[in-house]
Swiss-Prot record:
One of its GO terms (biological process) is translation. InterPro entries: NA-bd_OB-fold, Ribosomal_uS12, Ribosomal_uS12_bac. PROSITE patterns: RIBOSOMAL_S12. Residues 11-20, 111-124 have a biased composition (Basic residues). Residues 11-30, 105-124 are annotated as: Disordered. It holds the Pfam family Ribosom_S12_S23. With S4 and S5 plays an important role in translational accuracy. The keyword Lipid biosynthesis does not apply. This is Small ribosomal subunit protein uS12. The lineage of its organism: Bacteria, Thermotogati, Thermotogota, Thermotogae, Kosmotogales. One of its GO terms (cellular component) is small ribosomal subunit.
Amino acid sequence: MPTINQLIRHGRKRLKKKSKSPALENNPQKRGVCVRVSTMTPKKPNSALRKIARVRLSNGTEVTAYIPGEGHNLQEHSVVLVRGGRVKDLPGVRYKIIRGALDAEGVANRRQSRSRYGAKKPKK
């Protein structure tokens, strides 16, 4: 415990809030190029093959990003837009690829929550 005199001299140090997506450097999204597109298995109670991409961002950092939705057209050298947001059952995946932006196409035949997957409104 500091004395009152010590507090007057130095004051309390504010704790800095640690960013959950440091590679974005306080930007809402960042552009990047896919280096590798592959699958990954989730943590213990779940079982699947989640689609992920290793992306080199425009600032030079390489991150692992999740590809949401069913089916995708991404391959090596695809240019994608990356946003923050982790996938709870994939360790080390703290970013998501935005569907419907740049080279990532929207999800086909998507009828609900379309805006999240870059899908156009279906014809009547």
